[in-house]
Amino acid sequence: MSQHVGHGRKPRTPGPPVRSIRPFKSSEQYLEVMKEDLAEWLRDLYGLDIDAANFLRVLETGLVLCRHANTVTEAALAFLAEAPERVQKIPMPQVGVFCNGAAQPGTFQARDNISNFIQWCRKEMGIQEVLMFETEDLVLRKNVKSVVLCLLELGRRAWRFGVAAPSLVYLEEEIEEELRRDLDLPSPDPPPPVPPARRPCHFHNLDQMVQSLVSHCTCPVQFSMVKISDGKYRVGDSNTLIFIRILRSHVMVRVGGGWDTLGHYLDKHDPCRCTSLSHKPGSFLKPPGPPVQHEVKVQDGPSQPQPLMTISRSQSPLPPVDWKTYTSSSRKLRPPTPSSSGPRSEFPARARTPREMAPFLRSQEKPTLSQRMSSPGPQLSSPCRGPDLQSTLSERRVNRSPGELPRGRTPTSWVPKEADSQGAHTKAPIPQRLQIPETTSKKTPARGPSPPPRSSSLASPHTIWLPDQGASPEISEPMSAQSSSPGKGLTKIPIRLSPARPPTPGRGSLGTEGGGSMQRGSLSSRALAGNLDRSTHGHHSVDVSKDHQKVIQISSGTEDPRSLGTQERKERYTSLPLGRTREPALYDNLKEELVANMKLLEVGAACTQGTRSQAIPRSGVYVPSLGGMWPEPRGPYDKVIQELVQGPPRLLKVDLKAWKVGSECLPRPIVNPGSPKEEQVSRERGTRRKARPSAQGTTVKTTSPARGQDCSTLPVSANLKAPTHSCSDPSSDKAKVCLGKGKRTLRKPQKVPSIYKLKLRPRIRPRRDHRPEKRPSRIPKPLVYPFLGPARTAPGSRLLKATLGGTGGDVNGVGKKEEEKKKETSISLESSIQPSESREPMQLDGTPLPPEEESWV
């Protein structure tokens, strides 16, 4: 059985994926039942005005709780006086509770009363901590369940002393007695008191109530509950036995040491009810009807109708699924109506909403093969909208049996196009695979993986619609072609227009009032015929006329491709009723569109017949506002073409060390041939060319400038920035500094600096003495080899150097010869001493070790 879900749901704010449809959780039901039972218990004991609604409000002062504690203590002392031998078997309270009678709700006195009651329950009654509650649980309603369970346990224990207990305690005793009889168990040592006589339970009513609760699930395979005896049932596939009792108007189930409602028990154990989509609570009040699946209302807005989403949840094999149309939420469905035979530019017409589309797809009638062959005309002769169409189609659907539904349905999708810049609401169908514009179609058993659909009751228009401006120029209305197989209807085949001509930016299909035809050379019938021959699918073929010069008829009123005349088409179809004010405006709008489309077609024909330079290129951006003509190449376009024609520029190798902007790019003065300035310039060129060794892998891309262009427009590589000022003498220091500024690469330094100047750690760290009296120096001591003599004389040489330096600084009248001797002596001493700045260890040949081989003590 095919199921239809909501189509085209409107996007809304993201919420939880699945939301419970119950007004409150079913787990809270047994708490309400217990509060009702405890309220009746306290009302009978103390004559209070208490019920389930004001149960916690009466208890929040602690007065009733302390009063009941004192009552239980008195009953225990009286019971102890009668049977003192039971003191060892049953814990009995010996002391009562102090209570402040002037306590108000929410005050500290009320909290003190509740705290005294809690302490009495723990100390005197021995109630387990699992069943206890705290002061905040009652005052602030933080944990109502613990309060209810504690009072119920107190009622069980106090019943042993002869205090009246809640009704649930009496039901528990009945079930315990039944179990002892069935299992032949002995009675407890202190026999429990006899429960008071109560109204007998009508198990016939119990069976009816259980059957009513279980039958809320209408799945083919329901959760099994087998009756063993009165009030005893076996549930599910296991041998679990449950005891069910009626407490006032509730059906209670004995679970472990507590109670639960049958509805909540089924929600937890029934596989069908454990799903996220539960039953509606309103379904309990409905009269029993024919078995249906689970129905869940899906509502997008408060003012919109509510379709039913039917969900099948059963353990039996499901029937074959008949898939229907599905589109994502970003797309909206628009069914083709009989009003679509009118002019396509009628944008005031109301589009069908997705809410109306879902019943339309579900209730459309499917004609048989004989009906389709005998009456190729449409079955809906007048436009029907809204509830009239839905009621008519739903009446037709009632008479159809479920076995009539075919399999292998090909999904169809109707997607509205985007409105163009002029605001026309033109809708055009976009085909998916093989598309049928009508929503109804009849299928035969598939012979292939995806059989194409046949034509439906509504005849397809034999028209070709021109695409909009914003739409793709290759997608058009699928043409209807005669199928080669006998007994089959028409097959819709999408047509791709030839990309050789530009798309016409019209807003709708070209047509006249009488359905006349127009002949234009811009639409090539030969291209259409070729595309039709290539678009055959499966065993379906397309019959295309052999005459390639046949005019393609573009009309807006034709609906039946096998009809003979315009008069017959007018008789078969009923036009849309137009008002007196809308009709002239519609005709004026049609005339404007026809004139605009004719002009665009003439421009397109002129472009195809013109030269190749005026034709629209196959790539790039086509701007329809230019009148269908591509702008002529002029201005910067000529410069680009000229630069591309000249070919790739010549690449020059440039040395990075001696690189700078060549003198060709600088403004050269006008020099006569043979002048000394020209000779100097040529000499400098020769020197620079000799000093340019080929750098490894470094080239600068340059472009030879045009004759009329300035040298300053020469492009330079972005990685190397040329200096703005020229260096006249490349051998000078200034030239070296100038050349160094333009470099961005690392070069090998002449002298490797110290490791600590580079802020690098040595590979071998020095040993550290952590004794407080011997702290190592922060300056590491270099390693000195014993066979290196000059290194041992380092302190003396330093002293001698200092002496020489001091003498040379103090004496001013020394001759040049003495100064030269002192300089030679100091230079020889400095060369023999290890450099203190670098602190590098020496090898045997006197060369410094590389930085990788340094070691420190």
From Swiss-Prot:
Its main location: cytoplasm. Residues 432-857 are annotated as: Interaction with ADORA2A. SMART domains: CH, GAS2. SUPFAM superfamilies: Calponin-homology domain, CH-domain, GAS2 domain-like. Residues 201-273 form the GAR domain. The keyword Cell membrane applies. It comes from the Eukaryota. Keywords: Cell membrane, Cell projection, Cytoplasm, Cytoskeleton, Membrane. GO terms for cellular component: actin filament; ciliary basal body; cytoplasm; microtubule; microtubule plus-end; plasma membrane; stress fiber. Residues 301-316, 366-382, 695-716, 826-836 have a biased composition (Polar residues). Residues 508-518 have a biased composition (Gly residues). Residues 1-21, 282-572, 670-716, 759-857 are annotated as: Disordered. One of its GO terms (molecular function) is cytoskeletal anchor activity. GO terms for biological process: actin crosslink formation; microtubule bundle formation; negative regulation of microtubule depolymerization; positive regulation of G protein-coupled receptor signaling pathway; protein localization to microtubule plus-end; regulation of cilium beat frequency involved in ciliary motility; regulation of microtubule polymerization or depolymerization. Residues 1-12, 759-769 have a biased composition (Basic residues). Residues 32-159 form the Calponin-homology (CH) domain. CDD domains: CH_GAS2L1_2 (cd21268). Expressed in the cortical tissue (at protein level). It is found in: Cytoplasm, Cytoskeleton; Cell membrane; Cytoplasm, Cytoskeleton, Stress fiber; Cytoplasm, Cytoskeleton, Cilium basal body. InterPro entries: CH_dom (IPR001715), CH_dom_sf (IPR036872), GAR_dom (IPR003108), GAR_dom_sf (IPR036534). Residues 534-550, 559-572, 676-685, 815-825 have a biased composition (Basic and acidic residues). Belongs to the GAS2 family. Interacts with ADORA2A (via its cytoplasmic C-terminal domain). Interacts with GNAS, GNAL, GNAQ, and GNA13. Interacts with MAPRE1. Involved in the cross-linking of microtubules and microfilaments. Regulates microtubule dynamics and stability by interacting with microtubule plus-end tracking proteins, such as MAPRE1, to regulate microtubule growth along actin stress fibers. Enhances ADORA2-mediated adenylyl cyclase activation by acting as a scaffold to recruit trimeric G-protein complexes to ADORA2A. This is GAS2-like protein 2. The gene is Gas2l2.
